[in-house]
A protein has these predicted regions:
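Short, strongly patterned local motifs
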Residues: 341-400
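Conserved, mostly hydrophobic/aromatic
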Residues: 30, 68, 105, 148, ...
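Short, flexible/disordered intra-domain loops and linkers
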Residues: 43-54, 85-97, 214-224, 280-285
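Divalent metal-dependent hydrolysis catalytic cores, especially in the metallo-beta-lactamase
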Residues: 45-91, 115-123, 146-147, 153
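Catalytic pocket-lining loop regions of alpha/beta-barrel enzymes
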Residues: 4-7, 145-147, 156-270, 274-279
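Active-site gating/metal-coordination segments in enzymes
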Residues: 3-9, 84-186, 244
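Mid-to-C-terminal alpha-helical segments outside catalytic/metal-binding sites
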Residues: 1-27, 38-75, 263-267, 277-348
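Histidine-centered divalent metal-coordination motifs
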Residues: 30-36, 181, 210
Length: 400
């Protein structure tokens, strides 16, 4: 299988849009819209009977877009809402349910290509390894998703299980970015577990959603909050999404990573975790927090008073949208230039965009089983992107 025409068009359109807005876009990097057509009867009855919020209470794509408008958010990274689907004991039924939820995300992105960045979701535990791998392939090659997530907490499996690492290998081999719920709400995602995942493909990005938050009790969450902050500084390929985490720790994360400079200052994006959090509340809070960070001389953090200009407009914009935009841009460029994409072009008899489809600098990445994966040259693609954007070849120079 190779990228379908739909996937190629989806990726190309998204890439063009993100390249045109990266210097001003505001992105919510963690949202979970659902299709009401997929709600179970029980969920439908509960929604009709109870207007109050309950954990994970689903919102439709249209509701999400309205909330984004209210909050001044241009785009959202969207994956399915695990609270809106029901698993059974039958892995095939679970595959069908999760497939349908991913299709709903793909269709939402098709309808709103300038608002929605679609991301996939797979689950090796509920689906079984083969079906979970099949879903990864559909997410990337059929629907053109740049990111595929697993949730070790809600789906209940250790983040560094062998089967999870094999799923990471598959996502990477397809050219996409693996993402994980990474929180202190369960014991399934310790910092060492995410480190194992990150070291599996050290030149490849991996996304840790919640940066150690995710809804633990405040005191219980403290050790992972601290460990996550340190982990990212030792693994430059980890990209963190700041959502569902104490605001005080989020502020410290932002100051720490801004002080650390590139690449770390480019490895964080802010988010709401809607519908688990409100977009308006979170982005209202982020904007207010950044206003105080901009006023470094008057800030309570001594690191800021010593570096009062640390949070200039460019720094704030990085965290509010550009960091994630650039991660998706790099990924989309890689997907369009992947061996799978080249295969599709040959099959369709299309001319190559240029003569450089060989990926001659692809890395050899050994896996536990001794098998080798050909992966596209990440650094090379970054260089291409920078040239395309009319700035220097150095990755750090890419950034405003
Ligand atoms: Zn989330």
């Amino acid at each position: 299988m190779a990228l379908t025409g739909l996937a190629r068009d989806t990726i190309a359109r998204r890439l063009q849009h993100l390249q045109s807005v990266r210097d001003r876009v505001v992105i919510d990097a963690d949202t979970h819209p659902s299709s009401p057509a997929l709600y179970s009867d029980a969920l439908r009855r509960r929604l009709a009977a109870d207007p109050n919020y309950f954990h994970g209470r689903p919102i439709s794509g249209e509701e999400l877009l309205r909330d984004m408008d209210h909050a001044g958010v241009d785009m959202a990274l969207c994956w399915q809402n695990p609270a809106a689907i029901t698993y059974t004991d039958d892995p095939r039924e679970n595959f069908a349910a999760l497939r349908a939820a991913n299709v709903a995300i793909a269709e939402l992105a098709q309808r709103n290509p300038t608002r929605v960045i679609p991301a996939g979701w797979t689950d090796p535990k509920a689906l079984g390894e083969d079906e979970a791998a099949q879903l990864v392939q559909l997410c990337v090659e059929e629907w053109g998703f740049p990111i595929v997530k697993m949730n070790p907490a809600q789906n209940r499996f250790p983040i560094d299980s062998p089967v999870v690492l094999r799923m990471v290998d598959r996502i990477v081999a397809l050219g996409a970015v693996p993402a994980f719920h990474f929180g202190a709400d369960t014991a399934f995602t310790p910092a060492e577990g995410l480190r194992t995942v990150a070291l599996r493909h050290p030149e490849w990005p991996v996304i840790g959603v919640h940066m150690g938050g995710g809804g633990p009790a405040y005191v219980e969450g403290e050790p992972l909050y601290q460990a996550a902050r340190a982990l990212g500084l030792s693994c430059p390929n980890i990209f963190f999404v700041l959502s569902a985490k104490r605001d005080t720790h989020m502020e410290s994360d932002l100051i720490t990573y801004r002080l650390a400079g590139p690449p770390f200052a480019h490895n964080i994006a802010v988010a709401s975790d809607a519908p688990y959090g409100r977009i308006s509340w979170n982005f209202g809070g982020f904007r207010a927090m950044f206003a105080t960070l901009r006023d470094g001389a008057a800030h309570g953090d001594p690191r800021l008073r010593a570096n009062p200009g640390l949070f200039d407009n460019a720094a704030v914009h990085d965290f509010m949208g550009r960091n994630l935009a650039d991660l998706v841009i790099r990924t989309d460029l890689r997907l369009l230039r992947s061996p799978a994409a080249a295969e599709h072009e040959v099959a369709a008899g299309e001319a190559h965009a240029d003569g450089d489809q060989g990926e001659g600098d692809g890395e050899q990445d050994s896996t536990e089983g001794g098998e080798h994966l050909e992966v596209a040259g990440f650094a090379k693609v970054v260089e291409q992107h920078c040239h395309g954007a009319g700035v220097g070849a150095d990755q750090e120079d890419c950034r405003g």
